Structures are given as structure tokens and as C-alpha cells.
Amino acid sequence: MVQTDLRTAAWVCIAALSAIHSGAFASTTRDLPWYLEADSTRAAPASIQSAPIEPGQALITVAVIDSGVLKDHPALKGVLLPGFDMVSGPRNLRGGRSSNFEPDARDTSCGRNITSSSFRTHGTEVASIVAGNGYQNMWGVHPQARIVPIRVFGACGMAPDDMIDAIRWAAGLTVQGVPNNANPARVINVSIAGGASQCRPALQTAINEVTRKGTFVVVAAGNNFQRALAEPANCEGVISVGALSAENQITNYSALDPRTSIYTVGGGPPLRNNTPWANNKLRVATVEVGITGAENLVVADKGVGTSFAAPLVSGFLSLWLSHRPTLRPADWQSYADHFVRSVPQLTKCPDCNPNGLVIQQNIVKEKR
């Protein structure tokens, strides 16, 4: 979960999402990520054991509003659509907004000491969880989805107004001075948190606009160690996503708030057992730096945080919408009861009532 300057029973999407299309996984089921595993001998408690679900006929676009995406990563080949760099003003070291959605270079300093390289890798990692194409077994939840990458932060941080413009542009709304998005998203993933304790009116207005248009907004709850939701996860109309461990427990780093819509796999410290899920990390497309300083585009089991829980939900929604493209955000509550099961409650939040998503055989296709 990237921290930047920047609902009542908490449905918990245990988006292990073994309910992925069988065609894509037919030859690779022995090395699926543990959170996608359907095999009962390899499925973690936080996994869903269900029959694979073929994607529907509708092509669904997911916007990833993040640090940018590495367009040449082989795990995202054939997945990416044209995106945009929405970073404005002095924070944009390239001089201004453009169609170059790639992240800042790893050695970018922005005039201060950078202690994290997340601005280089974060967006690519998030996008791969949504729609990774199977390269080195980097399977996303819905590989047939298409990703529109939108960069809103880099080495110099993020301006709150850039987030508003990014959300509007992602859904196909007009943003002054920016060409229109030719591929409006049905799902917007925002794996960014740490903003204000109340949703700013301008941001809430933007979210209202895009949800009325039929776009789902999925937001990471934040890694604030069981404190209340911060912006943008505290805005009305978003699907805010907290994190579970492989053992189906709400993690100690996840935000904890009755308004949290869903908890799903976010990973954590390695488990002290020999299970296939003992690593307790999510598989991501990322960058490895060699001894010479050169970057290698790799796949690694290293993802931990609500940042990585959110794209599991975004991937599930895109899979669901591929069968039911007319569904809108207002429809989610009427469907959610068909997708939930309980997970252990924390005494620290007696009003949270967390439940988990169960994808029964063909439920995505058959539920009317």
C-alpha cells in the first residue's frame, strides 16, 4: 500500500478467485499463486475452492491509477492500452502531463533522499495482479481484462487534484487540457491511501460522477495498522479493500473500519508451516536490480499490503462484468449476499462483521 500526501457489514472478498477461466490455467494449475488455487490440497484458508469460470464475452477495461506501469514487462504483454501521465506541475520531472505512463526512473532523486523505489515498481505490480498474462506463472485474476495505466505519483509525490483528474479521465469524462480517454474503464483501481481523515468535496464529486456513469471505484483501505479509513478509501461510493493473511485473518497492518467494504488477501510475514501458502506473499510483475545496477523485468512472490488486495477485487469485478456488462455500482449490494462467507472478527472492531466472498460454481454467470 503506497502512502502518499494525498461499508457497514464489511464484506470480505476472499478474492483467492480460483474462479478464473479454465482455459488460461489449464496447463499451469500446479503453479498457480496460492490465492488463486482451487486444488483443495494447495488452497489456503483464504482461497476459494470453486470450479474455474470462463471469462464472458464482454471486454472489460480496468484503469490502474498508480505510479505508472512498465510497458515492456513481459507479464503485461498484450494487456496494456494507451494510458496517461496525469502528474502535473513541478512534481512531474518530465515537464508536464503526457501520454507517457511509465514510472520515473529508479535513480530519480527529486532533490531529496528517496528511501523507497515503490514509485518505480508499484503500478506494474498492481496491474499484474489484475490481468497478468501468465508469463513465469504471473497470472492475474482476469487475464482477458485490459489495463489503462494512469500515473498520478512519482519520485516527487502526488498532488491531490491530479487524483481527481485521473479518476475522471479514467471513466471517460473530460479533463481540461488532456485528450479524452478512448478506452473508458468499467473498473478503476486506486491502490493509494494516507490522505485526509474526511473525503474532500471535490474528490467526492468526482467519484459520484464516475459511479453514476457505471464505473466501479476500488480503493485500497490503507496500511495504517488498524486505524480508521483515510482518503480516498473513506469516500462514499467506493469499494474499500482491507487485507487478509493466507490463514484468513485480518492483518495487523490493514485499516480497520466498519466502512471497509471488503477484506481480501493482502499477505504478510511468512507462516511457520510447510503449506504451499506459507510464503504469504502475492505474486507480482516487478523489477530486480542486478549487481551492475541494471534492471531485470521479473516475477516475484513479494507483494504485501492492501495495495495488492485491491487489484484482486478489481480483477474479480472485471471478470464478473465480462458476464454481466450492464451491472452498475449500485447493483453490488444486491449481489454481495450471494458471494459472502464469514471470517474471524476482531474485538477491536465489533461493528465490522467481516465476511468473505465465495464464488460458487458458475455463480458469476448464473446469478441474475
Segments (PLM) and residue ranges:
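C-terminal subdomain of the subtilisin-like protease fold in secreted/lumenal serine endopeptidases
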Residues: 37, 42-46, 172, 178-192, ...
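Extracellular S/T/G-rich loop segment that most often corresponds to the catalytic His/Ser-adjacent loop
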Residues: 66, 87-89, 233-322, 326
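Bacterial N-terminal signal peptides
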Residues: 11-20
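Bacterial N-terminal signal peptides that target proteins for export
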Residues: 2-11
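Boundary at the C-terminal end of the N-terminal hydrophobic targeting segment
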Residues: 24-26
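Substrate-binding/access-modulating region of protease and related hydrolase catalytic domains
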Residues: 121, 133, 152-237, 247-250, ...
